[in-house]
Amino acid sequence: MSISKAAFLNHLQTLSRSYRHRVLPQPFLAVRYMSFATQEEAAAERRRRKRRLRMEPPVNSFNRSQQQQSQIPRPIQNPNIPKLPESVSALVGKRLDLHNHILKLIRENDLEEAALYTRHSVYSNCRPTIFTVNTVLAAQLRQAKYGALLQLHGFINQAGIAPNIITYNLIFQAYLDVRKPEIALEHYKLFIDNAPLNPSIATFRILVKGLVSNDNLEKAMEIKEDMAVKGFVVDPVVYSYLMMGCVKNSDADGVLKLYQELKEKLGGFVDDGVVYGQLMKGYFMKEMEKEAMECYEEAVGENSKVRMSAMAYNYVLEALSENGKFDEALKLFDAVKKEHNPPRHLAVNLGTFNVMVNGYCAGGKFEEAMEVFRQMGDFKCSPDTLSFNNLMNQLCDNELLAEAEKLYGEMEEKNVKPDEYTYGLLMDTCFKEGKIDEGAAYYKTMVESNLRPNLAVYNRLQDQLIKAGKLDDAKSFFDMMVSKLKMDDEAYKFIMRALSEAGRLDEMLKIVDEMLDDDTVRVSEELQEFVKEELRKGGREGDLEKLMEEKERLKAEAKAKELADAEEKKKAQSINIAALIPPKAVEEKKETAKLLWENEAGGVEEADVVEMAKGVEAGGSNGQDPPSC
């Protein structure tokens, strides 16, 4: 059977096609999405689908929840409620880095930069914590920079940084150090009434010690009673300060009474050795040497149960040294140095060496005193400015200026800065020994060191210079200090009298001239009479009146010139404003003014003529519509 050609070709095309496997669709699996055995399964399925599809909550529901939250009224906070201070947990991250940077500046003795950096940080993204502020305040307190301390404290209060108990204690200490116990007690009362904090044991110790130092033992006793009312436990340190106040007042019975009171409150035995030194002084004052030495054995004997700190040892050493028992003090000092084992036990401190220095100096053993003073470094104690001043004062009082100047040279080696007392002490000692130039050099160094000597030190300098016939030097120091010191009339009279006696009346008048130019200085009538009298001696009694009249004339001319300058400035401003107005606007203003003037004169304005013409065209002068044809 034959097939046609067309059919054969069609058969070949069919064979040449590639066989394609037909993929059948998978059978439908019936999954029950809308039916669950429990609500928990349904919720779990919803959460799974949201995670799989990464679905977010609907926008409208999110906005609705925000609106509901915004509609909830917030409680109104009282702005007068004091803020609570931050906890130490706030000192992390950048704020901790800032704190460490401030500590670095303080270690470098750059307190001005530390305080300035703290101020600037308040308005930065890294606000300082109260702990950083307290660090700067404490450094300023140690260096007796009380003005800077109070300024920084006022600044942080305005900045809203809540103080903590340490801040309050530093302020109390500052006012007590500058002998302002009344202000310190006012701040304490405000703290008790308003602060959201409770006082600490350190608060009462600072107040009691400061009040005793300011000879206000009665107020210190009241603070002790207030301490008991507030529920604080009996503190032997507070009692030791009160006993010290009784010793200052030569009240031996008060010392023994306080000790008995403390002993009763502690159950019959005082195990803190801080009170035994003052108790020994009380016994020595009553000439009860036997009881004093028994107290000494009870405190530091071999079988003693009394806990002795460095401060307790210092009080005992002081009691022995001041009452003819310096040999016993030396034995105790040697034993204490052996017992000293930092950091486990601190048996000596800076005060220990100061007590021994005073004991050696009282016995005239100044070489031994300087040797003990230089041993501080061996026991990890660094002398401060007060320690140097204490020993230098003892040396200067005993005409040992050379040794005092050696100690002054050691201050720079130990990175200790002299203060006003240091320079004043050396200056006065130089004057006593007739070394006027050396004393004046110490004063000049003090001024160049940015220290602020008071008027009394300046007066002593001027007195010695005038007595030595160094009027030019005295005038030079006057010119240096007149803008730095608030001089009284006596200071002006002193230098003026010296100039007058030397026949230098022109220089005296120049001083008056400068006083008249200075608005902060008042030339009193008493001073004017003094100047007139000095001028009368030289036959120039009218010069002062001429000078004052000339000053009044110059002031009047200056005031008139100031008013003229202000008027010229005002005219210049009006000219500048006129220059900003375009010329066309100026012409329009002139034309408007001309029309107004013609109207007032009774003439007919062109604008009125135009309006009348328009009225005629519209239907007459009465404004009615024209009749229709």
Swiss-Prot record:
One of its GO terms (molecular function) is ATP binding. Its main location: mitochondrion. It holds the Pfam family PPR_2. InterPro entries: Pentatricopeptide_rpt (IPR002885), PPR_domain-containing (IPR052308), TPR-like_helical_dom_sf (IPR011990). Residues 63-79 have a biased composition (Low complexity). One of its GO terms (cellular component) is mitochondrion. Keywords: Mitochondrion, Repeat, Transit peptide. GO terms for biological process: embryo development ending in seed dormancy; endosperm development. PPR repeats lie at residues 129-163, 164-194, 200-234, 235-265, 272-306, 309-343, 349-383, 384-418, 419-453, 454-484, 488-522. Signal peptide: none annotated. Residues 44-79 are annotated as: Disordered. May play a role in embryogenesis. Belongs to the PPR family. P subfamily. PANTHER family: PENTATRICOPEPTIDE REPEAT-CONTAINING PROTEIN, PLASTID TRANSCRIPTIONALLY ACTIVE CHROMOSOME 2-LIKE PROTEIN. NCBIfam families: PPR (TIGR00756). This is Pentatricopeptide repeat-containing protein At3g49240, mitochondrial. The gene is EMB1796.
